[in-house]
A protein has these predicted regions:
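Short beta->alpha connector loops at strand-helix junctions that form conserved
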Residues: 45-46, 265, 287-288
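C-terminal helical cap(s) of enzyme catalytic domains, especially alpha/beta-barrels
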Residues: 51-67, 220-236, 291-314
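N-terminal capping/small domains of soluble enzymes
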Residues: 1-115, 120-128
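Structural signal for hydrophobic packing residues in well-ordered secondary-structure cores
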Residues: 101, 105-108, 138, 179, ...
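Flexible, active-site-proximal loop/turn residues at the rims of small-molecule/cofactor binding pockets
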Residues: 23, 48, 148, 215, ...
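C-terminal extensions of enzymes
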Residues: 291-313, 318-349
Length: 349
């Protein structure tokens, strides 16, 4: 029997699979569906105080891109499809939204799970006030999203993406001072030094880190010669998994081993969850897979993880967390590779 619980420090999850913040978790119905599917936690759609952020939902658009970067049918898109979108924040008035989340989290207790309140930042002080209000309403866990991929494209003052370590420290410290509940901080990899962002988030009081947010992207349609979506957008896909796991592994090795890391961006199946754990994550946040395949994918991921652990004789998830990261050598420590030819030699005369 394998214990698939995950130790996230102040949070003990029944399993490491978290339904990430997305349009799927923008309604009570979506949150309930993810809980019913077996998610260890569900991160609600983000909110903030900026009217421009809420209005961004009015221009939201979502497409799946296939491996040829063409728009694909949602019903036929496979595991390799990439989500390319403009998304927005929940438009429900904050007081109503937070009250709904509190009710949802009360329901989550009956599933031995959590509903997490998510804040995408515009300014630090309002984010801190929202966090305090969430705690006062009874929420047990808050996520601070500093990685909003639309930050560079949105109207001024709507949302921000923080890529400066000092700014990360200041925003996290402001929210940490306003609340005592466990705080997760979601970071971007589009920075000169993502590890420095992680270090500053922890120094400022983050309990857990989520790595890494989606990327800004641009893709033309070669037939119409126009930009898909009519603009830039945020993009993520299974192709991003090695990029996510690179920074998970680096943070796992550089930060104290007591720092819980959550991987996001690129997980599509149970095997990908395993890859994240081997890289140093203690859990995963999945969004695109749920949007594409429905909340049933959560149960499929859990089943894949359970089958793997039984096959490998793993009793606790801690046995595999970071195993591959610890085995990774720096280039300078690698032995010379002995070879007599290269694969591309067949093209050379």
């Amino acid at each position: 029997m394998t214990d698939l619980g995950s130790d996230l420090g102040p949070i003990q999850l029944k399993n490491p699979i978290i339904c990430a913040s997305s349009e799927f978790t923008m309604t009570l119905g979506g949150i309930r569906a993810a809980l019913k599917a077996g998610a260890g936690a569900v991160v609600a759609k983000s909110v903030n105080e900026a009217p421009g952020a809420a209005r961004q939902l009015d221009i939201a658009e979502y497409v799946m891109l296939d491996s040829d970067w063409a728009v694909a049918s949602w019903e036929r898109a496979g595991l390799e499809a990439s989500l390319f979108c403009r998304s927005g924040l929940a438009q429900t008035p904050l007081s109503e939204w937070i009250a709904m989340l509190a009710r949802a989290d009360a329901e989550a207790r009956t599933h031995d799970a959590f509903v997490v309140g998510s804040i995408t930042i515009a300014d630090a002080a309002p984010a801190a006030r929202i966090a305090a209000t969430m705690e006062a309403a009874g929420l047990r866990w808050i996520e601070l999203n500093l990685s909003a991929p639309h930050g560079r494209e949105a109207v001024a003052g709507a949302v921000r993406q923080l890529a400066d370590p000092e700014a990360v420290h200041d925003y996290v410290a402001a929210v940490r001072s306003a609340t005592k509940v466990p705080l997760t901080v979601k970071l971007t990899s589009q920075s000169g030094d993502p590890l420095a962002l992680a270090e500053q988030a922890i120094a400022a009081g983050a309990d857990m880190l989520v790595l890494m947010g989606r990327f800004q992207g641009f893709m033309p349609d070669i037939e119409t010669m126009q930009p898909i979506l009519g603009s830039a957008g945020a993009i993520g896909g299974r192709w991003a998994l090695p990029l996510t796991l690179y920074w998970i592994s680096k943070c796992f090795k550089a930060l104290p081993r007591t720092t819980p890391l959550l991987a996001t961006n690129g997980m599509r199946c149970g095997d990908d969850v395993i890859r994240a754990l081997l890289s140093g994550a203690r859990g995963v946040e999945v969004a695109s897979a749920v949007l594409l395949r429905g909340p049933g994918v959560i149960g499929e991921m859990f089943a894949g993880l359970e089958t793997y652990c039984l096959r490998k004789g793993i009793v606790r998830l801690d046995e595999i967390v970071g195993r591959a990261a610890d085995a990774a050598l720096g280039y300078g420590a690698l032995a010379p590779v002995k070879r007599t030819s290269y694969p591309w030699d067949r093209f050379i005369r």
